[in-house]
């Protein structure tokens, strides 16, 4: 508003009209109505040609993301409060964000991976231990304690996060409440008798590892593959069936899932793999190709050519960026900012728009505020299991 008054001769009332136009959902149309008045005011003050156009374009672009100072104060307060909670109570902070989904910039997978990197133990759903939503539970795992100076230890010695049954694909909040209220359950068949679940819902719970609280014939935790086998049959053995008429409840001995297979199962069933980020299982191959982790980039000098790889979490092309596109890649150690020029985006458009994970070669840039960016030169798809689509913004 002050700039419109100073450089374009707007009155206070006209400047307020400009403010309202910038805040409007129909911003482009309302801004266009004020454009000629703005240029006339600029010309009266000797500002013409390319300079006048540049001033207007910057102002119009600001309308896409700008907000008043009072809003920025509120935002700063939220940022401070969030930072305080994450520092002092990282497990509770993570659980609260998971329970507020869908929301915000980061997916549940990114939120849980960040919590794990800060020393928080995140546990998969468990039919008898989980509530409907994410909860906190005592963690008794041994190890060194918390060091305030080391963010990777902030969650040590504190509670663990237990994912809720509501996080399982196809369950939903109402059914999750019913399941949680009915705890404990004796076995898979007991659940099927007491809660009306479809075959797909039973199999989703089994795939998520929620039946690990039950035991196999040898007393060990029920393996996921055997749980999936039994879940389909159990879904047919509901309260309206006579006991013993449904076959298949007792699964044969099946090979157990390895860590990679459990990670894929977690991502498919809940979108969250707390014990295994997808790139973790490719690290030996990535290392052999000279691909750096997000953490390792901190020790690479400015201007060096680097290779990075990860799951695409975000794509952004702000109106103020002159066509430049920004992507975030996530590996098992953190996030990498990748910048794509118009030329690079055009050359690799098909891959950049469709691939869920990427391997990127580019130049590393160290900004003055400590942020690292990789300016991309070459891009190729990376084949990994991905739990959710990227969150894309303009």
Which residues does each PLM region occupy?
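Noncatalytic, beta-rich nucleic-acid-contacting surfaces in large DNA/RNA-processing enzymes
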Residues: 1-394
């Amino acid at each position: 508003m002050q700039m419109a008054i100073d450089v374009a001769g707007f009155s206070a009332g006209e400047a307020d009209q400009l403010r309202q136009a910038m805040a409007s959902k129909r911003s482009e149309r309302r801004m266009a109505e004020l454009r000629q008045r703005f240029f006339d005011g600029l010309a009266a003050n000797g500002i013409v040609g390319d300079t006048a156009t540049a001033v207007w374009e910057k102002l119009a672009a600001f309308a896409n993301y700008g907000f008043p100072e009072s809003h920025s104060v509120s935002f700063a307060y939220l940022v401070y409060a969030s930072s305080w909670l994450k520092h002092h109570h990282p497990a509770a902070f993570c659980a609260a964000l998971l329970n507020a989904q869908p929301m915000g910039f980061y997916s549940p997978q990114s939120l849980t991976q960040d919590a794990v990197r800060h020393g928080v133990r995140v546990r998969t759903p468990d039919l008898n231990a989980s509530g409907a939503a994410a909860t906190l539970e005592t963690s008794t795992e041994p190890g060194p304690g918390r060091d305030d100076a080391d963010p990777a230890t902030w969650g040590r010695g504190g509670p663990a996060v237990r994912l809720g049954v509501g996080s399982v694909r196809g369950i939903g909040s109402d059914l999750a409440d019913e399941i949680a209220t009915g705890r404990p359950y004796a076995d898979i068949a007991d659940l099927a008798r007491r809660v009306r679940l479809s075959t797909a819902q039973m199999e989703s719970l089994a795939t998520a590892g929620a039946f690990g609280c039950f035991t196999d014939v040898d007393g060990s935790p029920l393996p996921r593959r055997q749980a999936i086998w039994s879940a389909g049959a159990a879904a047919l053995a509901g309260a309206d069936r006579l006991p013993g008429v449904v076959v298949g409840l007792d699964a044969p001995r099946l090979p157990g899932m390895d860590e990679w297979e459990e990670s894929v199962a977690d991502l498919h069933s809940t979108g969250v793999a707390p014990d295994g980020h997808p790139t973790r299982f490719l690290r030996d191959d990535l290392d052999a190709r000279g691909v750096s982790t997000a953490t390792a980039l901190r020790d690479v000098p400015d201007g060096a050519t680097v290779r990075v790889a990860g799951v695409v979490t975000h794509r952004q092309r702000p109106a103020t960026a002159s066509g430049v596109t920004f992507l975030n890649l996530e590996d098992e150690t953190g996030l990498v900012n990748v910048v794509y020029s118009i030329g690079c985006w055009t050359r690799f458009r098909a891959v950049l728009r469709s691939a869920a994970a990427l391997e990127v070669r580019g130049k590393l840039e160290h900004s003055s505020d400590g942020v690292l960016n990789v300016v991309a030169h070459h891009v190729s798809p990376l084949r990994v299991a991905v739990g959710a689509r990227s969150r894309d913004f303009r």
